[in-house]
Each structure stands twice: as C-alpha cells, then as structure tokens.
Amino acid sequence: MKPHTVSLVLSNLASLAAATCKCTPGHACWPSLEEWSRFNSSIGGQLIQSSPVAEACYSGPKDNAACQNIEKSWTDDVFQVSQPIGYAWPLNLSCPLPTPGLDTKCSIGNSPVYVVNVTCEEDITRGIKFAQEKNLRLVVKSTGHDSQQRSTGYGSLSIWLHNFRKGFRFQGHNPVLATCPKSGWKGSTLTINGGYSWRDIYPAAQKQGLIVIGGLDRGPCSTGGWTQGGGHSPGTHYFGIGADQVLSARVVLASGKIVVASPCENEDLFFAIRGGGGGTFGVVTEITVKTYPTKALSTINLIVGSKGDETVPKFLDAVATIYSLLPGLSKKGFAGYGNWVVRALSPITAKNYTNLYGQSWTLLGATQQEAENLFQPFKEEIVKHQSENGLEVTVSSGTFRDYFSYYYSMGNGTDSAVGGVSALASRLLDTEALQGNRKDLRKFLDSITQGSAVYHTLIHHGLEAAADVKADPTSAVLPGWYKSILLDEFEIPMNTTDVDAYAGSFEYLRNELVPLYESLSPDTGTYMNEADWGNMNWKKDFFGSHWDRLLKVKTRYDPEGFFYCPKCVGSDDWVENKGGSLCRA
C-alpha cells in the first residue's frame, strides 16, 4: 500500500472514531481553552472547571483549613449537594478523604470535567448546543442522590440544576385545566420551577396545611430523578407514586426546544417523564403536581429483637409472620417503613440486639384508638412469638396533628448522612410472595440469611391492596408498584467506595440473593432509583411492560441518543469504555 494511501486510511479511521465516540480530554477533538472561554462568556460566566471535592486535603493544592471543613462536612447532605461534582452515594470515588496508612490518591475520575451552573433555561439550551457541536458527553445532575451513578460521566459536560431556582407556588386550583381539560384533577396544586430539594418544599407545604408527595429523604430534587424515576413516600399508600402526581412539565429537549408535556401536549413525552427515568428524555425544568389537604394520623410502632445465633430461627419465624401480615395490614389502610437484620455487625439499641426488626406504620385520618383497634388482631399474631429465651416484642402507638408533624418526628427534619455506600439490591414483593405459601416464605428467609450480615430496608407501600389508588395508564411508573405490597431493599455495608474491594459482596447479592427474590416474586421488578447498578435484567425490572413504548418515545424526542445514562432507556446504543470515552455500540 502506498504511503499516501496509508495516511488516507488512518485519517478516515480517526474521523470514524471521532464520529462514533464522544470527545474526551487528550483527544484532538477536545475543545481548546479558548473555545471553553467563549462558551463560558455565552452563558454569563456560569461555567465551572471541576475539581474534586476533597482536593484541598491532598499535597500540591493542600489547604489545611479548607480540608478540616471538608472533613467535618463530608457526610453532610447539604454540603455534598452544594458541590458541582459532589455525590450522595459515590461508587469508585477517585478522590476520597485521605486515610492514614492508606495510599489514597486524588483525581477527577469519572466526574464531569466542566459544569454548567444553570441559573436559567437558556443556560441549558446553550450547554446542549455546545456539547452537540463539540461531540461531548452530557450528563444532568440536580442533587446527585443516585445509586445508579447516572449523573457522572468520564470526560463529560454537566448540566447542574442545583442553583436553578425560579420559585414555587401553591395554588387552590389546577392551572393545567385551563388549556387541558383532560388533566382531570380538580384539587389544589404546586408548581415548582427549578431544582428545589424536598427540604425546600416541605416546610412551606406544612404552613399551607397541605400534603405534598415527596421523598422520605428530603435531600433529592423535587423535579429531578426522584420524581422522574417513580418516587416512594410516606404518603404513597394513600395518594400513589411520586411520578403519578405530575400534572404537567416543561422540558428542554435534545434539539434545544422547550416544550410543555401534559395529557394534551406531547402526551407521549408526558408519559415517559412520569416514571421512565431521569436524564433520558430531556431536562425537566418545571413541574405542576397534585397537593392534598393535610390530615391527622396515628402510628403503630413495632420492635422485635433478640441476641445471639441461637435465637435466629425463632426471630425469623417472627419475621415470616410479619411479612405474611403485610397484605392484610394494607387492606386496613396501614403503610410504613421498617428495617431488619440478622447477625448485625455490631449490637443494636441499648439492649444490644444482634437480630432486630423495627417498623413504623401510619394510618392516615385515624385516631390513636382507632389505629390500635384495627391493629389488635395483627398484634396478637406477632406477640405469640415473644419467648422466655430472649425474643422480645414491643408494640407502641402514637398520634400526630398533621402529616408533616409525623414526618419530622421520624428524624427527617434533619438530613441523613451521605457519603457512605453499600452493595445494594432490591425487589418488589406481591401478596402471593408474602402469603401464598408460608413454608416457602420461611425457607426463603433462611436462605437469604446464610451469608454476611445483610441489612434490609422495607417500604411497605401496600398499593396492591390500596382501595383508592390505582395505576395511571398515562404514566410510565413500573406496573410492579401497583401489583405489590412491599419493596424489600437488601444491602451489605462497604467501608470504601472501591467496588473491586467488595467484589465478593456484589457477587453474593447478584448470584445468591437476587435469584431467590426473583423466584419468590418473579413478575414485579424493582425500583430503579434504589436498585443494583449492575442489574442484568434492568429493562424488565426497572421498566416492565412499558419498555417498548418508552423506547419509541426516546427515538422520537432524542433520535441521536444525545441524553445518555447507564441502565436508562436507549443506553444499550452506547458502550462506556472503562476509564475512557462513551462510544456507539
């Protein structure tokens, strides 16, 4: 082959690579400093060159005073959210806090290289245009509360919505009805324009005497991935999943066009952004959601505890009974959150339990006496497990004047610690799984407690048995939510964000525990926002029967697949090279 022919072939190959892979630092196609500067000027100086959150703690840029503040604030949710590349639950963190005795290093890793600090919709459209012109990977981040790592991306440009705040307003009517009679909702509403966390919304809602369906954790963004991915809350049993509250939305598309999505405009997009996942179909800048008059509520609180391995069989007998009672409790109107563990890594509570089940149920609109009376038959079944050899059962009750008084009593008036991660998976369990065969359920509990200590978080939403809440056909919420009683999240704690160091824990979850859960409840799936990032059946488990329809919406509104995130609709058109660029599959 002649030299000029070889050069031509190599040139064509380089062009082909540029066309099929996103540009990353070090490649000839990466924008020059001058180009970045011009882009920064076009968005009013809102471009941030990223630096790792803990960078000040490392030699070179080390700043002892700044480092002390970072160390003190590291697990503070508000602190991490306020950082352009701060994340609540980071995996493979490339710049952890230095640990004495360990050779920790600091780099930007898979975090975005530049960040658009969005303050208006025009910043978003200009960021999209620049990323498309320069063939850059774009990621969308509101608060970074994401176990799936969807708001990170090697060599990317980030659209950061934390400081985009144009206000929120409560209304005694549904403004969507003025242009869209099909909206249907005739109650009060809340319009949120910007990247407000639920912590911003809840105090105002309480003052208005209203219930807003938002996260149990008040840290996530109200217009972001929590809502777009589904969203469970203390009010889910009574009012439905978070995504189903949305009446309309403003969305910035990959084309740069800003559209309204409602039952009357862009109906297919309206369907997709309500449960089809965030960061996928466009950038949502505003939503209008349903609100509800607040009510008094009562609670039933349960603790079952024991010490030592010898009590584990009787403890699991009690857990099996509680699980089997959940569908019946749902029919009576009870719902709530719980936790349990067998052989805890360290003793729990002042009684030093090693095996503990704790649950708090709510009954909206009921007095304390009414709640106690309705719970009595269930209490009698649970108390039967109390024994002289150390299995203790405690049941108490309470009452609250309104929804948010209860919410704040749960400790949610303060922000939960962030920064730590775990090997996590989850499954929605239906009535058949919980009540179909008691012996099979008990064997299942034995099987999932044979290995390392696994900590369970229970979201007893009870939608399968909810009398007044049904699946919305105009919503992409996973159908399994409305065909199940319980979301069981199971996790193994990690002392580092290094996934490779805990490869055995992830293998145990994926190869041992997850198949057992799938066998118990095969057709329900799980909640995409609180699931294993390595789930191999993610299309079925995260989207269920909606997958094909969502893929059509993706193709219509983002035909080039510009918006990419892992395990999202359309993501299998791309491949993430380890430590490198994003390329066409």
Swiss-Prot record:
This one is known as: FAD-linked oxidoreductase apf9
Q: Function of this protein? A: FAD-linked oxidoreductase; part of the gene cluster that mediates the biosynthesis of the cyclic tetrapeptide apicidin F (APF). The non-ribosomal peptide synthetase apf1 incorporates four different amino acids to produce apicidin F: L-phenylalanine, D-pipecolic acid (D-pip), N-methoxy-L-tryptophan and L-2-aminooctanedioic acid. L-Phenylalanine is the only proteinogenic amino acid directly used by apf1. The 3 other apf1 substrates are non-proteinogenic and have to be modified by other enzymes of the cluster.
**Where does the UniProt entry place glycosylation sites?**
40, 92, 117, 352, 412, 495
- SUPFAM superfamilies, per database record: FAD-binding/transporter-associated domain-like
Q: What class of enzyme is it?
A: oxidoreductase
Keywords, sorted A to Z: FAD, Flavoprotein, Glycoprotein, Oxidoreductase, Signal
The Swiss-Prot or TrEMBL record lists the needed cofactor(s) as: FAD
The chain residues annotated with the modification Pros-8alpha-FAD histidine are 145
Biotechnology usage? Apicidin F, like the other known apicidins, is a cyclic tetrapeptides with anti-malarial properties via histone deacetylase inhibitory activity.
* Pathway annotation: Secondary metabolite biosynthesis
The induction annotation reads: Expression is positively regulated by the apicidin F cluster-specific transcription factor apf2 that binds to the eight-base-pair motif 5'-TGACGTGA-3' called the 'Api-box' that is found in all promoters of the apicidin F cluster except in the promoter region of apf2 itself.
